[in-house]
Amino acid sequence: MINPLYRKHIISINDMSSNELELVLNIAAHLKFKPQPELLKNKVIASCFFEASTRTRLSFETAIHRLGASVVGFSDAHSTSLSKKGETLADTISVISTYVDAIIIRHPHEGAARLATEFSGTVPILNAGDGANQHPTQTLLDLFNIYETQGKLNNLRIAMVGDLKYGRTVHSLTQALIKFDSNHFYFIAPDTLGMPSYILHTLIDHDIKYSMHLNLAEVIPELDILYMTRVQKERLDPTEYINVKAQFVLQIHHLLHARANMRILHPLPRVDEIAYEVDQTPYAYYFQQAGNGVFTRQALLALVLNKYLTE
């Protein structure tokens, strides 16, 4: 049986069915407990980061090495012909695709990853974040952690806190969880950084419950997952950043009435939105979350490059 993700571009979480999402999570769980150090032996994968990244890039490159593949690429767009010589993204991808078996791309411009698919031929493109648009591999690792801690992806109460306007992680995660039944969302953000209307309209179209709040404490007792985000300084003007950066800070006293099963996730980096004392509580799961990113990215690479990998 051919796996449905073989040679598929991974650009948006919306491009994946619930069955495909579950396939990635199942393979990730398998690889976590049964490493396959030669699964991608002799494969070469390009890591093309036109925008700064630490966790995503290192997580992907660790995943590549642990599967036995080789990695080539760059972490600074200013060192490339695209920047120095004016080469187009189309030409860059057209050339790189002749060298490698898959291309991982992060780019500051929305839509860049999908544009890359038009010039990569049969080489799959994996979107590692395009502007404020999508970050599907982060979403997959978020889903993995939710399933690992809650044992399900449906009938959950999930709060998303902080920068919901520019935070591509919360956009992608909400769209992924829409594919599973009976989830209830709580959006906690200042008015200037609320969830985009297109996400809210999608929730309404699917008859999914959501509510908007300005108070973190009032919803914590109801939650299974508390998804914190930082206010993204690089996407705001300085005045707006100063006004909102510390408006929603999770303190240890907020957790006094939390459910025993509740877990705190964060895509990282953290600035000051989670007090360091919270790290020592059983609710904190963001460092385990980051570690699990290696397994979910291993699973995704394994699936797009292995025709018959289904379990």
Curated annotation (Swiss-Prot):
Which processes are annotated in GO (biological process)? Answer: 'de novo' pyrimidine nucleobase biosynthetic process; 'de novo' UMP biosynthetic process; amino acid metabolic process
Gene3D superfamilies from the UniProt entry: Aspartate/ornithine carbamoyltransferase (3.40.50.1370)
Which PROSITE patterns does this chain map to?
A: CARBAMOYLTRANSFERASE (PS00097)
Single GO MF descriptor: aspartate carbamoyltransferase activity
* Record key words, sorted: Pyrimidine biosynthesis, Transferase
Leading EC class: transferase
The protein's matches in InterPro entries, at most eight in alphabetical order, are given as:
Asp/Orn_carbamoyltranf_P-bd, Asp/Orn_carbamoylTrfase, Asp/Orn_carbamoylTrfase_sf, Asp_carbamoyltransf, Asp_carbamoyltransf_Asp/Orn-bd
Coiled-coil regions in this chain? none
Residues the entry annotates as binding carbamoyl phosphate: R55, T56, R106, H135, Q138, L268, P269
Q: What metabolic or biological pathway is this protein involved in?
A: Pyrimidine metabolism; UMP biosynthesis via de novo pathway; (S)-dihydroorotate from bicarbonate: step 2/3
Q: Name one GO cellular component term.
A: cytosol
- Please tell me where L-aspartate binds in this chain: K85, R168, R230
Q: Does the keyword Cell inner membrane apply?
A: no
EC assignment: the record states: 2.1.3.2
Reaction catalyzed: carbamoyl phosphate + L-aspartate = N-carbamoyl-L-aspartate + phosphate + H(+)
PANTHER family, from UniProt?
ASPARTATE CARBAMOYLTRANSFERASE, ORNITHINE CARBAMOYLTRANSFERASE, MITOCHONDRIAL
How is the quaternary structure described?
Heterododecamer (2C3:3R2) of six catalytic PyrB chains organized as two trimers (C3), and six regulatory PyrI chains organized as three dimers (R2).
Function, as annotated: Catalyzes the condensation of carbamoyl phosphate and aspartate to form carbamoyl aspartate and inorganic phosphate, the committed step in the de novo pyrimidine nucleotide biosynthesis pathway.
**NCBIfam families (UniProt xref):** asp_carb_tr, PRK00856.1
In which family does this protein belong, per the annotation? Belongs to the aspartate/ornithine carbamoyltransferase superfamily. ATCase family.
Name of the protein in question: Aspartate carbamoyltransferase catalytic subunit
**Organism classification, top ranks?**
Bacteria, Pseudomonadati, Pseudomonadota, Gammaproteobacteria, Candidatus Palibaumannia
